[in-house]
Amino acid sequence: SSEEVPEIPEMLENVLLFALDEAKEKMEEGAELVPFTTLVVKENLFIESHPGDSSEECYNLAQHTVEGARGADAYAFCYDGYVETDDGTKDVIIAEGGVPGAKDGYAVGYLYTVDDEGGYTFEEEAAYIGEAPNFMAKLKSGVDYGEDEIDEKYLTEVDEDPSTGIDTDGE
C-alpha cells in the first residue's frame, strides 16, 4: 500500500521481527499458533502465550500482561490474522507492538498462502500494516523503574540463546 512506513524504534522493530519469525517457525512445524507476547526487559526476552476462546479474550490477556510489565522497554503481540487488500482478504501473521509512553504502536506482518496440502508459503519481507494500539502507552521507560517496582518474574537470570543473542526463557 502507499502508506508511509514510519521510523520504528530499532529495539521495537527487532522484537516485532523476532515474534514474527517465532510464529512462522511454529506454523511451518505444523503447530497451532497461540497468540503470544514477547517483552524486552533489561536485555532479556520473555515470551508468554495467551490462549483464549476468542480473539478478543487473547487480546485482553495480552494487553493485561503488557500493561503490567513495568521495566520493559518494548513488546510485541503476535497472532494469526488477516488483512483486507485490493486483492481481497489475505492471511497474515501479525505482530503489533510499542514502546513505553508512545501514543501509538505499530503492526507488521508476514503475508502467507496455504496450499492444498496445508503447506505454508510466507512472503520474504515483513510488511508494514499500520498503526496499532500501544499497550505500553501508560508505562514509563524501563530504566525509570526501580527493582522493587518490577515484577519478580522479569528479574530472574535467564539462559541466553547463543544463536540470536536474545534470551528465550519464559517460553
Regions found by a protein language model. Give the residues of each.
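N-terminal domain-onset segments
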Residues: 1-65
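A charged amphipathic helix-loop-strand protein-protein interaction module that recurs
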Residues: 55-85
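Solvent-exposed loop and beta-edge segments used for protein-protein assembly and interaction
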Residues: 30-32, 71, 87-89
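Low-complexity intrinsically disordered segments
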Residues: 74-171
